[in-house]
Design a protein with these regions (language model features):
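Arg/Lys-rich, alpha-helical DNA-contact motif
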Residues: 1-71, 109-188
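Polyanion-binding surface elements
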Residues: 65-86
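Short polybasic/polar patches that bind polyanions
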Residues: 77, 91, 122
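Residue-level detector of functional hotspots within protein domains
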Residues: 80, 93, 112
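Major-groove DNA-recognition helix of helix-turn-helix-type DNA-binding domains
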Residues: 83-103
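Minor-groove-contacting beta-hairpin "wing" of winged helix-turn-helix DNA-binding domains
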Residues: 103-109
């Protein structure tokens, strides 16, 4: 029904299925419970990223707004984000950075807030496309539902991004794993 590929979840499920096929139901039940625990961690991370995003957008921690302009290396160090990630996020349209006359990028306090949001969502395994979709919706409607924006690809999105419904996918995977756990218990 649904496949969640992140953080080795698929491999764990395959291992559990093989273990069950060998009729080692006790080990298979242990594996499915580990899988469920990891799904719960992933869901918690996804929800936490949404909470952090709401907090940043609500103005909590706006002290960054008064910082002087920073260069890429300074931003990288301040936010513990690699310079490659900053370049990647810029190339993928998540961030548009101003430049000085000499061509150096300069990051504003607003840019830092946006980067904190992107970092939180990426750490929770949201795709670049989901983040871009959410940022676009928020720029048009600051009151937009963050969870819905992250979890609802548009009809124009590619087939790859249709699989980008992280919270929905994790919820479906959890539901399926509980069903499998019940079946394994019955088979035991």
């Amino acid at each position: 029904e649904i496949e969640v590929l992140q953080n080795g979840l698929r491999k764990k499920m395959i291992r559990m299925v093989k273990t069950a096929a060998e009729r080692d139901f006790d080990s298979a039940i242990t594996l499915i419970r580990e899988y469920l625990a990891q799904i719960d961690q992933e869901r918690h991370g996804a929800e936490e990223a949404i909470r952090i995003t709401r907090q940043i957008l609500s103005g909590a921690g706006q002290s960054d707004a008064f910082l002087p302009y920073l260069r890429r290396r300074e931003v990288s160090e301040a936010l513990d984000i690699s310079m490659d990630a900053l370049r990647n996020w810029e190339m993928n349209g998540l961030l548009s950075v101003k430049r000085k006359a000499n061509g150096y990028r300069i990051y504003t306090g607003e840019d830092l807030q946006r980067l904190k949001i992107i970092r939180a969502l990426r750490c929770a395994n949201y795709s670049l496309e989901a983040i871009l979709r959410m940022l676009g919706e928020l720029s048009q409607d600051p009151e937009a539902d963050i969870r819905k924006a992250l979890d609802t690809p548009s009809r124009d999105d590619t087939i790859i991004s249709v699989c980008d419904k992280l919270i929905s996918s994790l919820n479906a995977a959890h539901k399926n794993a509980v069903l499998i756990e019940n079946m394994l218990t019955d088979m035991k």
